[in-house]
């Protein structure tokens, strides 16, 4: 049996030159993405490698159509996913910008948020509230000082789920005006003698909006810092 030796130098291949891609020379893409993650540039780099692979393939074992189709499908899938990710990122950034603009309008406004402390100014009424997650057969609300002395006591019956607002006149149980400062608020809610979830709510003034790791934090000064989702009500 005779043997035939095939040398790739004896075969004339098309003179296909892979395109030279210079990321610095590539025209800036329209979506302002870096060239190494921009879908059109991913395709250019892939085609450059594919052409080089075809030119340097083993003539005795050429690339099969199925392999070529598979590689093209992979780059199309990767390109499509990159485009989708870029679109989602741009959409998320736009939502964040719009949210920041809306939150900036809260500066100087009073908001009601979950809090176990209220800030009282002497000789003025202080607003506060409770948030019930289900109907309660009894509710007890207390305002106390740092010595645990009860200054305000209110008892309710058959209270529906939801938010309920109240005002404290700043007087203790003996009708004496208390000093300005922070006071504690506690709420016990029951349904048929079983404790049920309840939040105490206080009012704070929005001092500023702080961006932290892409998230908005609302600074309420003495009332602390909260997230936008903590706001239960924006007061007039």
Swiss-Prot record:
Question: What Pfam family is a match for this entry?
Answer: FLgD_tudor
Record flagged with keyword S-adenosyl-L-methionine: no
Task: List membrane-spanning regions.
Answer: none
Q: Which UniProt keywords apply?
A: Bacterial flagellum biogenesis
GO terms under biological process: bacterial-type flagellum organization
- Note the Gene3D superfamilies from the entry: 2.30.30.910, 2.60.40.4070
Where does this protein have coiled-coil stretches? none
The organism's superkingdom is given as Bacteria
Q: Which InterPro entries match?
A: FlgD, FlgD/Vpr_Ig-like, FLgD_Tudor
Stated role: Required for flagellar hook formation. May act as a scaffolding protein.
Family, per the entry?
Answer: Belongs to the FlgD family.
Please state what the protein is called.
Basal-body rod modification protein FlgD
State the species of origin. Answer: Buchnera aphidicola subsp. Acyrthosiphon pisum (strain APS)
Per the UniProt record, the lineage of the source organism begins with:
Bacteria, Pseudomonadati, Pseudomonadota, Gammaproteobacteria, Enterobacterales
């Amino acid at each position: 049996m005779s043997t035939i030796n095939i040398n790739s130098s004896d075969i004339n291949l098309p003179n296909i030159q892979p395109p030279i891609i210079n990321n610095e020379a590539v025209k800036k893409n329209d979506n302002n993405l870096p060239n190494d993650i921009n879908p059109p540039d991913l395709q250019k780099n892939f085609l450059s490698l594919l052409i080089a692979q075809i030119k340097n393939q083993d003539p005795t074992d050429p690339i099969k159509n199925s392999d070529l189709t598979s590689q093209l499908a992979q780059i199309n899938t990767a390109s499509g996913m990159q485009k989708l990710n870029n679109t989602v990122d741009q959409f998320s950034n736009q939502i964040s910008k719009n949210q920041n603009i809306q939150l900036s309008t809260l500066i100087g406004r009073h908001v009601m948020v979950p809090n176990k402390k209220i800030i009282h100014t002497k000789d003025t009424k202080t607003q506060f509230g409770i948030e019930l997650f289900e109907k309660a057969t009894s509710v007890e609300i207390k305002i106390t000082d740092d010595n645990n002395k009860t200054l305000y006591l209110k008892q309710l019956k058959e209270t529906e789920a939801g938010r309920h607002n109240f005002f404290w006149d700043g007087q203790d149980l003996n009708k004496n005006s208390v000093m300005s400062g922070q006071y504690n608020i506690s709420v016990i809610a029951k349904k048929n003698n079983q404790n049920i979830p309840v939040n105490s709510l206080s009012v704070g003034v929005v001092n500023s909006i702080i961006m932290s790791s892409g998230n908005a934090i609302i600074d309420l000064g003495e009332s602390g810092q909260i997230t936008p989702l903590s706001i239960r009500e924006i007061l007039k």
